Design a protein with these regions (language model features):
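ABC ATPase NBD coupling module
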Residues: 20, 74-90, 119, 191-193
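Conserved catalytic motifs of ABC-family nucleotide-binding domains
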Residues: 163
Length: 228
């Protein structure tokens, strides 16, 4: 929780998301996340974790309420401002979403190419993040030759290459065995220590026990618990 008096990086005010009249994925959610926090979003399947992350990424808009990131109300922004917002938010999914016909290097570089970075800067940043995630020796490897843990590390490198202030990880260890689960979580902790604000959606109790951090529990779209 924010204790230094600085403005929270992420603020939600009475946010609800309703897909149908009977289906409310989020119900009156209010919370603040400080710059530099690592926060777990927990709860059973269907609790609203993924919906919350999609709203933060502006992939969807809330039915009610306001979302403010770095002082900007993201759903009052012009449509032209959304790509700039997303450039400041990295996203990691459970199923990696790697390009099968591209090498590790190309998968990570692509995230910089699409926003127009010059080749020299792309080479510099891709090299840095692949070393950070421990894949400097796999740059020419294709995804189908990687383990599940290595594929997830590529996905994390891709999410970090544009130096986002926020990393959203949606069940990032959901498809991994226990040893790889802790390997990926240690990497996310390292990312957080380097200054990135990290939100991890998970229903894996082992992570919560092994990495005691602030935990926001959701059930039926409502926050039921918020604390360490």
């Amino acid at each position: 929780v924010n204790t230094d008096g600085a403005e929270p990086l992420i603020r939600l005010f009475h946010v609800s998301k309703q897909y149908t009249r009977d289906q409310r994925a989020l119900d009156d959610v209010t919370l603040e996340i400080a710059r530099g926090e690592l926060v777990f979003l927990t709860g059973p399947s269907g609790a609203g974790k993924s919906t919350l992350l999609r709203l933060l990424f502006a992939a969807e808009a809330p039915t009610h309420g306001q979302i403010v990131i770095a002082g900007r109300n993201i759903h009052r922004m012009r449509q032209s401002g959304i790509p700039l917002l997303r450039r400041n938010i990295g996203v990691v999914f459970q199923d990696f979403k790697l390009l099968a016909n591209r090498t590790v290097w190309d998968n990570v570089a692509f995230a910089m190419e699409v926003v127009g970075h010059p080749p020299r800067e792309i080479r510099r940043r891709v090299g840095i993040v692949l070393r950070q995630v421990g894949l400097a020796d796999k740059v020419h490897t294709f995804p189908d030759r990687l383990s599940g843990g290595e594929q997830q590390r590529v996905a994390i490198a891709r999410a970090l290459v544009n130096e986002p202030a926020i990393l959203l990880a949606d069940e990032p260890t959901g498809n991994l065995d226990p040893a790889l689960t802790f390997e990926i979580m240690n990497l996310l902790v390292d990312v957080n220590i380097r200054g990135t604000t990290v939100l991890v959606a998970t229903h894996d109790p082992r992570l919560l026990e092994a990495f005691p951090r602030r935990c926001i529990a959701l059930r039926d779209g409502r926050i039921t618990e918020d604390g360490a």
